[in-house]
Amino acid sequence: MATVSMRDMLKAGVHFGHQTRYWNPKMKPFIFGARNKVHIINLEKTVPMFNEALAELNKIAARKGKILFVGTKRAASEAVKDAALSCDQFFVNHRWLGGMLTNWKTVRQSIKRLKDLETQSQDGTFDKLTKKEALMRTRELDKLENSLGGIKDMGGLPDALFVIDADHEHIAIKEANNLGIPVFAIVDTNSDPDGVDFVIPGNDDAIRAVSLYLGAVAATVREGRSQDLASQAEESFVEAE
């Protein structure tokens, strides 16, 4: 199963927190000290906590669970999308729309509209419209794809959230809490760990650190899914006998 070592984390700068003046006292148990007015995260805590989170995500994936990757900061946006797609999961990498989880019924209607517009753009419907109407629908399609494209095939609520930056994505975390959906999150020294079921203390800004987290999560999810596919194959083999 995918794991991450102390050396990997040091190379990626996972241990660099935020400036000391911006700290959240609730993160004190995970802080090693400070250097040049920047908090240093205790990787002796982070390594086992992250690997525990990876093991749990592996189990969720192995039982066909849906994992929603959330990271809407510009620096993480593309990496979040790439990681989710690489393991056939789902993502929100632009703005989190309030009610995305708690008002799923309405979101489902918007997804239906998105899919209808996609069909229209491909079957020649747009070509039959006036230029103005075609432009309006193209803009609507782009807007919906931007906000819902990563969840349009999710088919229901996710079984877990993996979040880059608990502070920035606090609305998503609160919605997951309300619905009892487990939250796995990167929590930096300026963030509140409350509401996060699997806290991963670490740098949430450095792209190398973000890439490390996402790469490991995607790998463990792929492994979990392959276990599920292997067990399905075994079952069908037994039935065939």
From Swiss-Prot:
Q: Which InterPro entries match?
A: Ribosomal_uS2, Ribosomal_uS2_bac/mit/plastid, Ribosomal_uS2_CS, Ribosomal_uS2_flav_dom_sf
Q: Which GO terms describe its cellular component?
A: cytosolic small ribosomal subunit
The entry's family comment says: Belongs to the universal ribosomal protein uS2 family.
Q: Which Gene3D superfamilies match?
A: Glucose-6-phosphate isomerase like protein, domain 1, Helix hairpin bin
Give the range the annotation lists for the signal sequence. none
Q: Which protein, by its recorded name, is this?
A: Small ribosomal subunit protein uS2
List, in alphabetical order, the Gene Ontology terms for molecular function in this entry: structural constituent of ribosome
Instruction: Please give the CDD domains that the UniProt record associates with this protein.
Output: RPS2 (cd01425)
Q: Which organism is it from?
A: Klebsiella pneumoniae subsp. pneumoniae (strain ATCC 700721 / MGH 78578)
Keywords, ordered alphabetically: Ribonucleoprotein, Ribosomal protein
